[in-house]
Amino acid sequence: KGGFRVPLYPVTPLVAIALNLFLAVYQYNFDARSWYITAGWIMAGLVIYFLYFEKGVEAEMPQVIGISQPKPAVEYPHRILIPLHNPENVVPLMQLASPLAGKFGGEIIVLGVIDVPQNLPIREGLRFKQYKMPLLKRAVQFGRDNSVPTRTALRVAHRVYDGILAAAAEEEASLILMGWKGYTTKRDRIFGEVTDRVVRHAPCDLITIKLADECSFERILIPTAGGPHADLAAEYAAVFQKALGSKITCCYVVKKDHTRRDVETAHEWMEKTIRESGLDESVERLILEADNVAAAIVQAGSGYDLTLMGASNEGIFSNVLFGEIPEKVARYSWQPVMIVKRYEGAVKSFVKKVLG
């Protein structure tokens, strides 16, 4: 129950909103400069807050607490952060991360986040760190068995995604690799609250993968369409091809009423992808004829162990996480789907943070 009540709710706030709108319109007609000054003042306040005062607030009322772990003996240039929660995902996520760490001369950081209810002090979570360690130690053992540098990280947070994002920033992660259980039924979320937030605000490259009960990466389908995200996905596919012996198939979707030029363009895109990503010539080429691109990829992907694709390019103000086609493929495919998203830069990330 709230600590106070607003008289005549909701009439009072509605009247206040109406009066403020009237005042704003009247002020604009009286002197438009006041609008510009106000807008500039608000933007300056936001910039100053995020650059300076936010750190002071965080110090007084931390949203995330880091639990000290042994420092690495060697500083690696590439760090892969794997948030772990589901014990069934440990092996497949480590199988994917290990060759990437080996390729880029990096290490794997397995992260456990202890979530504390909002009505409890965040430091209460420190008492439960022993319950997270067995899961993390299992991943560390996998890394040790495969000669991949692996260490643990622990965070306590009121919200799991805050713990993941804070760890990624503090550890200067190059890549976040995380699994997800499937789509949520809530309309304002796509992959679930945690995954949605991490995808939107990740400070580095990101891979999210929908895993199945039994995971194998012997046959991988790569839809090619160009763009920075798809190019990065193809580079990762080349790593899996060499390290895991995966058989790769590049595909391109053309319309049913395609022209000869459309087919030539498809071959050009596939050859460009293979050449620039480092895939070898054993890659199969596949042209799909369909008017619905996502449905064609889902149908083709049913014969593969994994569909690996890059996110679509979206505008800076877009609410779409990966793009319409990748999200539909992830939603409707029964097979594992991996979506790769390259870091979009500080400016775009800042705008998305301000807009929420």
PLM features: residue spans?
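Extracellular/periplasmic helix-loop-helix junctions in multi-pass membrane proteins
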Residues: 25-39, 317, 321
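Small/aliphatic-rich secondary-structure junction motif
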Residues: 70-131, 135, 142, 150-153, ...
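Cytosol-/stroma-facing membrane-proximal "stalk/adaptor" domains immediately downstream
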Residues: 124-207, 218-219
